[in-house]
């Protein structure tokens, strides 16, 4: 599994090197997919049958990573447009990107909420608390993009969001 993921990342790097400015192909979605698979890969490889709770976990990671990447594209819209980079925002527009982010946030909250109906696992509570915190921080970055654009704070905060699960693991399991 790891070799397949590594090969897909290698193909991505070759692809963006040769085609990056020519055509938009959805790199944000691909990167979010690779991120979510990479996080879950050790568990996927370890177990025979993937339980529904792991699928919920993966979908939530994918949505959060997608929000993060499209949010960065939206904030960097003018710079990317000027430099000729293709991104979701430069192809679809900053306003459309904002709408997609809001739809993804709404979908995340629906999936997050429904997990409490379908899963009774106590361990789920810790992860769900971190996930809703991550989504809340990303929503805050979206709402304060003008202020956070200065000194690129949006990027620092947006990247730190993905460190929160590690902090949670250290605190709870450490």
Model-assigned labels for residue ranges:
Residues 28-44, 90-96, 156-169:
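Small-residue-rich segments of transmembrane alpha-helices in multi-pass membrane proteins
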Residues 25-26, 84-99, 121-126, 153:
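Membrane-helix boundary/juxtamembrane motif in polytopic membrane proteins
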Residues 59-67, 103-115, 165:
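Hydrophobic transmembrane helix bundles of membrane-integrated enzymes that assemble
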């Amino acid at each position: 599994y790891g070799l397949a993921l590594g090969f897909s990342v290698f193909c991505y790097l070759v692809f963006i090197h040769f085609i990056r400015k020519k055509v938009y192909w959805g790199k944000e979605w691909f990167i979010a997919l690779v991120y979510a698979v990479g996080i879950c890969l050790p568990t996927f490889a370890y177990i025979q049958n993937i339980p529904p709770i792991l699928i919920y976990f993966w979908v939530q990671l994918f949505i959060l990573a997608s929000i993060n990447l499209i949010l960065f594209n939206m904030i960097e819209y003018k710079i990317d447009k000027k430099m000729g980079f293709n991104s979701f925002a430069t192809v679809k527009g900053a306003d459309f990107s904002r709408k997609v982010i809001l739809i993804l946030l709404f979908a995340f909250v629906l999936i997050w909420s429904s997990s409490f109906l379908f899963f009774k696992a106590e361990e789920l509570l810790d992860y769900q608390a971190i996930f809703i915190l991550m989504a809340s921080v990303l929503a805050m970055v979206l709402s304060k993009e003008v202020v956070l654009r200065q000194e690129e704070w949006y990027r620092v905060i947006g990247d730190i969001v993905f460190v929160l699960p590690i902090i949670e693991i250290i605190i709870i399991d450490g």
